[in-house]
Amino acid sequence: MFEYFYNEIFRKTIISFGTLFNDISIKHTDSDGNKSTSKVPLAYGPIGKFLARLEQSPNLNKSVAMTLPRMSFEFTGLTYDPTRKVTTTQQITVKDPDTETTTKKVFMPVPYNMQFELNIMCKLNDDALQIVEQILPFFQPSYNLTVNLVSEINEKRDIPVVLENVSFQDEYEGDFTSRRVLYYTLRFTAKTYLFGPVSSATTDIIKGVSVRYLAGGAKSTERDVTYSIK
């Protein structure tokens, strides 16, 4: 029952979620009207880790100070979703995408919801607003991610990523030497599926059919007819 298999579904979903936000930029305009564009860095990890680094190096003149704005995301939870459950005894049978001569099968997947947090950390409120406004219009309230959940059978599915809520906090406490940090937290749910092990289905394929029937009746000669297709 518990044979080894690893479809990397969690890993693929986490990576796909992160790619949604890895190309966000902000613009600044100086006093002369010149505009500059900078890409917002994105990293995986809890927000507490980044806030701790800010507290350890609050001096903006130090080369080790962490630059803002920046974003981080994290996989925070996992729950079973009974509303998307299907019959578990059914199977998906497909041709092996590598050989096209053999067939593989896998049982229907189990639905799970993955919870994510996206944290946006900024020094200026306008930077945060620029970032948030580039994200929210695409979630109404969901955005579909196409993920190849099982590469072995090329099983691609659209994974809805639902925006659950948005919260805002201003971490500006202490004296004038303290560094101000504004951050938004966006919480999402990705409705993914977990597949079990993939096995060979070549031996289960019907390669020939034979049909036999009797033709005729009481007033005619009966004929025993057999058709075979291979």
Task: Name these PLM-found stretches.
Residues 1-8, 78-79, 101-113, 123-143:
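Extracellular/virion structural assembly segments
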Residues 21-25, 77-79, 114-126, 139, ...:
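Beta-strand elements of well-folded, non-transmembrane domains
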Residues 58-63, 100-108, 171-178:
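Catalytic micro-motifs at enzyme active sites that drive phosphoryl/nucleotidyl and oxygen chemistry
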Residues 82-106, 110, 114-120:
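Aromatic- and glycine-enriched beta-alpha-beta binding-site module
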Residues 83-86, 196-202:
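Short conserved micro-motifs at the rims of enzyme active sites and ligand-binding pockets
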Residues 95-101, 204-230:
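Short, cationic low-complexity segments
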Residues 108-113, 130, 137-198, 205, ...:
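Acidic-leaning, charged glycine-interspersed low-complexity segments
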